[in-house]
Amino acid sequence: MLGFNGFPKSISTSVNNVACHGLPDERPLEDGDMVSVDVTVYKNGFHGVCTATYVIGNAKDNPLVRYLRSVAEECLYKGEPHFNPSIIGIEI
């Protein structure tokens, strides 16, 4: 993301209620936090991104966390067949 529309970082971290592209800061992660990490690359005029979401501590036992993760996984599997090199992700 570094430089894309003025974004100041190559890695973004979205903690809890931050939807996406949060800026890393000094706040320590706490038990129960959900954090998504986006790592981006810019090469030959194209931006690529890889994202992973992690649950910190015992939140894996939290029903809301399990539900959010299952819905996100379902969306991934439903959208995945529609991706190809000619499609822009926002179109899906």
Task: Identify the residue ranges that each predicted region occupies.
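Active-site neighborhoods and metal-handling regions in enzymes and metal-associated proteins
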Residues: M1-I92
